[in-house]
C-alpha cells in the first residue's frame, strides 16, 4: 500500500509500553481506591530537545487511543487518528516538537482498564475496576511525562474529552503547562450530554451478553464467551449521530436509498444513512470494549472543575497557561456556547485566553478532520508558544 510521502508523515511508528506506580507508590484515585500498578501504551513523534522543553502532550477523545499519527506497518490501511495534523511541516511539527500521545486510563488499547487482568484475582477486572475521573486520567499522563524525564511541557492539546483533560492539566499542574489548547469541549457536561451517555450505557448493560460485565474470554480458555456487541454497537450508533451535524448528514446522505431503487415496505435497511450507522456500530465493536465505554462516559459525566464561584477562584489561582479555546459552528454535542462559557470563566479570572470559532459542516467530528483555517490557527499558536519558550525563530 502506498502512503503519503514520508516528508509529510512520521512514517512507521512503534507503540511503547511502560508500567507506572507500584505497591509502595500506588495511584490514588479520586473515588478513594488505589491501583497498585498501571500499564500505559503510548507513542511519541519527533525528538525531545536537549533542554527537554519542546514536548507537546496530545489527549484523545472517548474512543481514541495512543496511535495519533503514522503507521504501525507498511500494510496499515489508515494512519493514526490525527495524522493530518502531526508530522513534518504540520501544525504539530515534528521537526520542532516532541509529541506524546497515550491511551487513557480505563481504555482498552494497551493501558490498564476493565479488560486488564486484576493482579489480585488473575482475572479481568470487569466491573470490579474502580470508577475513574478525568483527574485520574491526567494523573496517569503526568506520571508518564515524568517517566520520560520531562519536568515542564510546552503545551497540552485535546479535543472533546481530550479538551477536558487539557483543562484538567492546566488546573492540576499549573507550573508544568504554559499553553493549553481546548477544542470542541466544555467545562462540564449539560444534562442533555449526560442523558446521551446514560442511554448509551443502558444499551450496553441491557444486552443479554453483558453478564454483569463478565464477558471476557481468557487465553487458552476452550469456551468463548459472547460479548455485548449489539448493545455496544447501538451505543456507538446513537453517539455517532451526535458527532455529526444535520447539514453534514443531509449533504452526505439525504434520503438516498441504499442498494435499491424502491422502498422495501419492511424493516430492511432502506436508507443509506441506516447502512452507514450500522457500519459504524459493527466496526466499533471490533476495536473497543463495552466496559471501557461505561467507565469513560462516567468520567466525562463527573467532570466539573468549576462547580461554584469560590471553587473557580481557587482552581484558577496560580494557573500559568495561555489558553486557546476552539469550537465549530455545527457542533451541537459541544456547541460554541459551551466553549464561550469556558472563555468567560477564564477571562473573569484574568487568564490569557484566545477564542476562535470555525465554520464546518462536519459537526463535532470537525476537530479531527482537515480544515485549513483551523489548521493554520492551531499551528500558529503552537509556533508562538515554541518561540516564546525556546527563543527559536520560525
From Swiss-Prot:
Compartment annotation: Cytoplasm
Summarize subunit and interaction data from the UniProt record for this chain. Homodimer.
Q: Which SUPFAM superfamilies match?
A: alpha/beta-Hydrolases (SSF53474)
- Entry annotation: catalytic residues: 160 (nucleophile), 331, 364
Give the E.C. number(s): 2.3.1.46
Name-wise, this protein is Homoserine O-succinyltransferase
| Residues at the site labelled Important for acyl-CoA specificity | 333
Sequence ranges assigned to domain AB hydrolase-1 in this UniProt record: 54-368
Q: Which InterPro entries match?
A: AB_hydrolase_1 (IPR000073), AB_hydrolase_fold (IPR029058), HAT_MetX-like (IPR008220)
Q: What domain of life does the native source organism fall in? A: Bacteria
Q: What class of enzyme is it?
A: transferase
Question: Keyword Amino-acid biosynthesis, does the record have it?
Answer: yes
Q: What does this protein do?
A: Transfers a succinyl group from succinyl-CoA to L-homoserine, forming succinyl-L-homoserine.
Which Gene Ontology cellular component annotation is one that this UniProt entry carries?
A: cytoplasm
Any GO MF annotation of the entry: homoserine O-acetyltransferase activity
NCBIfam families, A to Z:
homoserO_Ac_trn, PRK00175.1
Q: Which reaction does it catalyse?
A: L-homoserine + succinyl-CoA = O-succinyl-L-homoserine + CoA
The UniProt entry's sequence similarity note says: Belongs to the AB hydrolase superfamily. MetX family.
Q: PANTHER family per the record?
A: HOMOSERINE O-ACETYLTRANSFERASE
